[in-house]
């Protein structure tokens, strides 16, 4: 999960890419005590994905509304696996 990019589309149509860093993952774990990120991937809960996007955008320097108002501005979240990122890099 660390190093995975998120493509986050907000309801205003703006699109941002932010990386799941250790800082983002730790913030997510603090907000979801007792839960593992791997379990989130297997048993998808929309609020957890929204919070991951929220933290990733904040850590990337994107100005977002405070949680939970951020949820109302969220349009879509796409996970970009590490392997696909490597494929898109020039030789």
Q: Over which residues does each language-model region extend?
A:
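Charged interaction scaffolds used for protein-protein
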Residues: 1-16, 23-91
